[in-house]
């Protein structure tokens, strides 16, 4: 999916919502535990309930890998179900990979050849040769970690050099030498607030994947005020605030209502550019 197609989906749905599929076997409704594949059963119900109101899904690999083979099978089934039934949805493998070149090449092969996923999150710490293997696939996206929403972002990402330049700013500037805004996005946490203004000075045209609204306390209005550009330029993720709002047999309907509420807020924000 290219950048224009992504924007067309945003305009059509009046939404830039990504639903995070951080599916924890300990948090899903009890009645699903009797299913032969409870993780997939949960994901399928969530996807069916929310697809009208979002433009992307983001399975977090840690939640699937923690369950071994069964978890990976559920992940693959989820990806295939979305592709077959909702082909306009942008799929993000939230894997945060990044290693020496030949290892990254294997990660890239997994997500882009075997699974044919649209994008994967990548950690930039090891530099260009750890990222470029992911960039060799036409039509696929790298979503590079830039400024995250966790407290630990202060340990490295927000540290300044002698000239006052912060590490995340170096990442943004240097990585633009590796790919353009048709193949690279950046992760920027919603809790970073005014930092979006500084980020847009460096990457005015790139899409930003923004986790951290909802349960993590980020402000959608603030993200849009400082981060939205003429093609929206935002994919805002909500996980717990949608998928875990209800643990009864009505969980899917509750998730749909939560997604609809976020979509309606996003539709208001999009009026500034549509």
Curated annotation (Swiss-Prot):
Its EC number is 4.1.1.23. GO terms for molecular function: orotidine-5'-phosphate decarboxylase activity. This is Orotidine 5'-phosphate decarboxylase. Disulfide bonds: none annotated. The active site is at 96 (proton donor). It comes from Bacteroides fragilis (strain YCH46). InterPro entries: Aldolase_TIM, OMPdecase_type-2, OMPdeCOase_dom, RibuloseP-bd_barrel. NCBIfam families: pyrF_sub2 (TIGR02127). Belongs to the OMP decarboxylase family. Type 2 subfamily.
